[in-house]
Amino acid sequence: MDQRRTCPWALRSDGDGRSASLLCLLLASLSWSASSSTSFSTFHSEHRDWTFNHLTVHQSTGAVYVGAINRVYKLSGNLTILVAHKTGPEEDNKSCYPPLIVQPCSEVLTLTNNVNKLLIIDYSENRLLACGSLYQGVCKLLRLDDLFILVEPSHKKEHYLSSVNKTGTMYGVIVRSEGEDGKLFIGTAVDGKQDYFPTLSSRKLPRDPESSAMLDYELHSDFVSSLIKIPSDTLALISHFDIFYIYGFASGNFVYFLTVQPETPEGVSNSASDLFYTSRIVRLCKDDPKFHSYVSLPFGCVRGDTEYRLLQAAYLSKPGDVLAKSLNITAQEDVLFAIFSKGQKQYHQPPDDSALCVFPIRAVNAQIKDRLQSCYQGEGNLELNWLLGKDVQCTKAPVPIDDNFCGLDINQPLGGSVPVDGVTLFTSSRDRMTSVASYIYNGYSVVFVGTKNGKVKKIRADGPPHGGIQYEMVTVFKDGSPVLRDMAFSIDHKFLYVMSERQVSRVPVESCEQYTTCAECLSSGDPHCGWCTLHHTCSPRDSCERADEPHRFADSIGQCMSIMVQPSSISVSQHSLPLSLLVSDAPDLAAGVTCLFGNLTEVEGQVVGSRVVCVSPAARDVPAIPVDQDWFGVVLQLKSQETGRTFVSTEFKFYNCSAHQLCLSCVNSAFRCHWCKYRNLCTHDPTTCSFQEGRINISEDCPQLFPTEEILIPVGEVKPITLKARNLPQPQSGQRGYECVLNIQGVIHRVPALRFNSSSVQCQNSSYLYDGMDISNLAVDFAVVWNGNFVIDNPEDVKVHLYKCAAQRESCGLCLKADPKFECGWCSGEGRCTLRPHCSPQPWLDWSSRNVKCSNPRISETAEGCKALPGAFPQQSCSWAVSAAAKSDTAVRRE
């Protein structure tokens, strides 16, 4: 059976002709992992220990290439697996040099994983360069289509890049001039094997994969070579010294590498934990095989008093119009986005406090040019101790230094101590930022930042003074795995490929659909998002039909459509009324509009310019107003007959004036309600009032009681109650007069009342009772009515207070402590608290009397700790300690 028919995507596993059947079974079991969640397509590692290392996307085909431990994968754009190429494990030993694939090795061999350390697409030759950690770091050139091995150069020492088996320490840049063989600039950590591996080199990359010159140094002689090695003296000084290559790129005539390395000051500690690290930007001319153009400067950024110097990741991009303007550069220039952690220690376990910074390449080059000019003027030293081993004085030479200066055989290699400081855009004190990628959308620089906890921050880089604005954060890896350094966009820039050690996810660059209103959409800060008006959706412009027509696509919040209805509410008794809807910022509605009143009814709208006329619901469709409410709201929507989608809405209210039983609540309602004074009725139609003078629509004209002095009525006393009022109506023919209604302990008492004029009414003489002697003062709900049940408003809640002098005042002292407003006194002869008229000609005491002294005072309690003296009267021996409560009970008043 043809293996490729049953497993067509398992094209090739390795170059030794072994059967692909095992690989086919492996891939069949793996294919389920390229699954899709709610938002993301994902691809998972086939073995827990075979973690992912590198990722790149072909900018023409959209194929995704993933370098992992023991595998290189080719995936489709939606992360389904196409090819898996085996790179390990193999029998090896790091001490075998040359590796055993060249000559036998006496060291003990073990099955060793192959860590992918470099994955670069060589576009012009349609091949993939994949370099690993096996066999001292040999590389393979793989055909892009099927990952077939084109060549695996391994027979010369130039073919061994580095045996370091830690990913993220090597970076390569391919430079190719049209019609010529390419060059591979490569920087790598060497793990102390400086004799075997250069830390930086440029190598030949012939078009012919079988060329014997493949990966040879561009220039190599006894005196000059296209390489830099770490001196043994530096390793003797700092045994842990190495240079980690984080990122690299070509821009203009130069190649740049971004590195992190230990500092090498005199007297430095040899402990790895005590090392200070410096992030540096290294520049070489593309056409400088002698490396005379080597310049290395420290770089980082600062916010406030905090320095960010530990490089985590970087990405070369364009600034876009907005960021370019703030940086005073053009939108076509290159800028470098970089992530730094705080400080300069613990590079391998960096602090969570991190920063996103931007460096215009123009500014980097300008600072390098200044450094070159000062050195060629003989100022200072070369400042590259790790490489030169000592301070070397700059040599003065009358050499013009222009923007493309590539060095001479003097004043090289050149270092520096003054850092290139970038512009800090965004900082985060938690969840350290670990990766960065950027692209331009609609003039904005949109930056995507991965974090230690598996999230991606979306940041709009506006530049000074606003910096970077985080407008969204997406959880990509639910297990909280860190986002690795490599991120890449799909060729249409609609997706971002994000990688952790065990998962690759395809994340949409925008999630505009999450915003359901125009205001939410256009205040989100996401430059991708605009409001597609007639589709009533938040989307990118290119997803909105006819977006270029006026008002079809809103990209600022001031362009959101709004609707104003006249009238904005109607009474439940009004039916089929024409409503005028003014729609602002509306597109052409000539295709037709439908009016929807909630789920009540749907009617055709008449479009007249920028207005739409809708007819309100018929009587059968008018909603019922809930009890205890005077209105009910429905959503009035306009639906486009072109798109079938509602595109603008507002609340429309149906109100019921008759829900109001009092004049003040009627005229103070939110609606056009009127009070018919002589009908005691609230209505939306004032013409229904009996008399013109009976129509009220302002609170000042409502009949209402005014507060007066407190109304105090002793129980059993026959007294009138006189009240102040305003606008009291004169009962008309056939209408009954006024009454006062008191609710005394649940019993309604109606008392005839006399209206003196429009501002005064009096409840006629009457007496009132309430039950119980445990209540001395009872506030009674009170109302003035006329014509039986027409209630006069009582906005200040005027009450009648009934009281009993004797209630809870059994002693003389308690009686005399009663509030003077009640006019209670102690009737000594009868031994009770009462009003004076009810006390027979006996001594009657109240607080206004002179020399008041209750007879036979009693001490009911004494202060704690008071002790009567033996043989003494208590009131004499402890009168000074009588408690406040006892004084109240006895009410002793002494001269």
PLM features: residue spans?
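Cleavable N-terminal signal peptides of Sec/SRP-targeted secreted and luminal proteins
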Residues: W9-S33, V634-L636
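Beta-strand-rich domains and repeat architectures in extracellular enzymes and scaffolds
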Residues: T38-Y73, L111-E125, K166-D181, F185, ...
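Structural signal for hydrophobic/aromatic residues that build the beta-strand cores
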Residues: L55, V64, V72, L119, ...
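Beta-rich interaction modules in large eukaryotic scaffold/regulatory proteins
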Residues: Y471-V483, S562-A586, G592-H660, E700-S733, ...
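Beta-propeller fold recognition
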Residues: L82-K86, E90-S106, I121-N126, G132-H240, ...
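Signal-peptide-cleavage-adjacent N-terminal segments of secreted and extracellular proteins
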Residues: S21-Y123, R127-A130, Y135-V138, Q194
